[in-house]
A protein has these predicted regions:
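Conserved AdoMet/S-adenosylmethionine-binding subsite of the radical SAM
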Residues: 102-265
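N-terminal [4Fe-4S]-dependent radical SAM core
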Residues: 1-76, 80, 84-89, 306-312
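Short, conserved acidic/polar surface loops in the N-terminal third of protein domains
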Residues: 80-84, 90-95, 128-131, 156-157
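Auxiliary Fe-S-binding modules of radical SAM enzymes
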Residues: 1-36, 205-314
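Flexible, active-site-proximal loop/turn residues at the rims of small-molecule/cofactor binding pockets
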Residues: 30, 88, 122, 173, ...
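Conserved alpha-helical substructure of the radical SAM core
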Residues: 86-115, 282
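Flexible, glycine- and charge-enriched loops at secondary-structure boundaries
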Residues: 94, 98, 185, 189, ...
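Positions that flank functional sites
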Residues: 97, 123-124, 298-299
Length: 314
């Protein structure tokens, strides 16, 4: 990892992007520093929903003491089925400046978390990276986990080299049709491939662990959607074709219908065991070497952000 002074120009350049915002592929080009709002509805603020030790991530991320997870408000995708819809579809939480966010990061260190995990960081990148570097100057020595939706601008990801230690991107859609239908982002597959390629270039296509705890690398996540199994299979095909079958995959079964889709012909139900096993077996047949899988009990990981503690840890 480089020194803080090395990254100062990168942080300044990220802040400049906010003047005509192209942090994500939607490229709204609004002046967020002047209070203009684009798709994410964020101006020049960081809005924090919750910060807590998270015990429900992949085992090398959560470990025994939890990931130091900061849930950020808003999103550049706003999927119709979003499991975090309470904070992604609206601006919900506390407006937080860089210094206070740095203190939140240090409080998670003091809670003995294994890392600092940023959830939905994309619209907030300039300020949260500045806060993380500030926390490092104040003594932080933990890996940074970038947990994103996969709809990223590769040029922005390039600027995070040496700051982010572990990338945890979603790869939601393998087809433009499904990406447009469910997220209004027809170009999602192309941008997911390009941005994850840049992540791999930075940290490799494996997960480096010490005593079972992730220190560097990446895991690609995919949430299986009921009735969209062909989409899942196409995601796996794209990963193998454009990335590598050695990259760790987290294939998730925890989909829970939210109120907005309760009457949807497919999304209004949970996935079946047969659907999940179909996708897992396809991944194995394609030669993927490192797969994190879930059992049906993990569906309880769906949060309720209206509560002070959004998860019910067993």
């Amino acid at each position: 990892m480089g020194t803080n002074s090395e990254f100062s120009p990168e942080i300044d350049q990220l802040k400049e992007i906010l003047i005509s915002c192209v942090l994500c592929p939607r490229k709204c080009k609004v002046n967020r520093r002047a209070g203009e709002l684009g798709f994410c509805r964020l101006a020049d603020d960081v809005v924090v929903s919750h910060a807590l030790p998270h015990y429900g991530e992949e085992p090398p991320i959560s470990g025994t003491r939890g990931a130091g997870t900061i849930f950020l408000s808003s999103c550049n995708l706003k999927c119709t089925f979003c499991q975090n819809y309470q904070i992604s579809h609206s601006i919900s939480g506390t407006v937080t400046d860089v210094e206070d966010l740095s203190s939140i990061i240090l409080s998670l260190r003091d809670a003995h978390c294994h890392n600092i995990e940023l959830v939905t960081p994309t619209p907030h990148v300039p300020h949260i990276m500045e806060a993380f570097l500030m926390a490092q100057r104040r003594g932080l020595n933990l890996p940074l986990v970038y947990n994103c939706g996969g709809y990223e601008n590769p040029e922005v990801i390039h600027r995070l080299k040496g700051i982010v230690d572990i990338y945890l991107p979603d790869f939601k859609y393998g087809t433009e049709k499904d990406a447009l239908l469910l997220s209004g982002a027809k170009d999602y597959p192309r941008h997911a491939i390009d941005s994850i390629k840049e992540m791999v270039r930075q940290v490799g296509d494996t997960l480096e662990e010490y005593e079972g705890i992730a220190k560097r690398g990446m895991v690609i996540r995919h949430l299986i959607l009921p009735g969209f199994i062909r989409n899942s299979l196409e995601v796996l095909r794209l990963i193998k074709t454009h990335l590598s079958p050695s990259v760790p995959l987290s294939i998730m079964s925890q989909y829970t219908p939210i109120p907005a889709v309760k009457n949807h012909p497919h999304l209004g139900r949970r996935i079946t065991r047969a659907e999940y096993e179909h996708v897992i077996n396809y991944a194995l047949d394609m030669g993927f070497e490192n797969i994190f899988s879930q059992d049906e009990n993990d569906r309880a990981l769906t949060p309720d952000f209206e509560k002070k503690m959004p998860f019910n840890w067993a």
